[in-house]
Curated annotation (Swiss-Prot):
PANTHER family: GLYCERALDEHYDE-3-PHOSPHATE DEHYDROGENASE 2. It catalyses: D-glyceraldehyde 3-phosphate + phosphate + NAD(+) = (2R)-3-phospho-glyceroyl phosphate + NADH + H(+). Its EC number is 1.2.1.12. It comes from Thermus aquaticus. The keyword Magnesium does not apply. Belongs to the glyceraldehyde-3-phosphate dehydrogenase family. This is Glyceraldehyde-3-phosphate dehydrogenase. The lineage of its organism: Bacteria, Thermotogati, Deinococcota, Deinococci, Thermales. SMART domains: Gp_dh_N. Keywords: Cytoplasm, Glycolysis, NAD, Nucleotide-binding, Oxidoreductase. The record marks 176 as: Activates thiol group during catalysis. SUPFAM superfamilies: Glyceraldehyde-3-phosphate dehydrogenase-like, C-terminal domain, NAD(P)-binding Rossmann-fold domains. The keyword Protein biosynthesis does not apply. Pfam families: Gp_dh_C, Gp_dh_N.
Amino acid sequence: MKVGINGFGRIGRQVFRILHSRGVEVALINDLTDNKTLAHLLKYDSIYHRFPGEVAYDDQYLYVDGKAIRATAVKDPKEIPWAEAGVGVVIESTGVFTDADKAKAHLEGGAKKVIITAPAKGEDITIVMGVNHEAYDPSRHHIISNASCTTNSLAPVMKVLEEAFGVEKALMTTVHSYTNDQRLLDLPHKDLRRARAAAINIIPTTTGAAKATALVLPSLKGRFDGMALRVPTATGSISDITALLKREVTAEEVNAALKAAAEGPLKGILAYTEDEIVLQDIVMDPHSSIVDAKLTKALGNMVKVFAWYDNEWGYANRVADLVELVLRKGV
């Protein structure tokens, strides 16, 4: 079963890099941009640097390490020739078709499963790898959301806190690199703060990541919320979680639980470090969440935990993991 990508932007390209490195065949890429530009942006990346292979193109194909990948520019998802290309799993990474009613058009085009690389509406299931991936049922789940990068950073930490100590309620702030949903210079935007120049401001804004965590950890429903501060960095973010627990704890107890999870059931998803790191140290880190143990604080039953994440590369790795899970379980 082959994979297709709709939307070859920041996430689509990084997911492609990872799938290519894992030997997963991407048979078709659909994007409204011309092939010359798609090939150039795959070959050269301001954050992740040169693609580790050969990239070429013509009017109909991209060529990666000599392998031809069909490239189309179709606006209507149901008209994309997924079936013709042998694509069973579509990665929907345009950011446009996040409503299941729109995303299911890929199924009409011949795909069997759609993985949305964003929080979705009306999806069959939201999956955060390492947290609730075992709930995936190929007979029932066809439109799948991989949640957001921030939900993927929060959920593993909250899972540990909830299971080890119990969470009464919690708030979070993600200090998050700017994204395409901001303005380079002051320009109109429906969010007046996001309308301001991204590269010179700290921009308070909303995030649904905390509430969305309850989709994969239902016990937290109504007890976890938060906000975002967008900052002038190109990738890399850090979640600041403050939780009231069901018993008093020490920072050492909390760190021990997080470290045990990182070395055990959440290995590869959650990382743990006692090094005094900064943002550039976690760029291109494949984990969903990297606990910065020296920043953990406890006061009675209140605890503060900081977790870094590369909001592009870490998230793209989880999309790739989810693709492999779907392929492994069958469509």
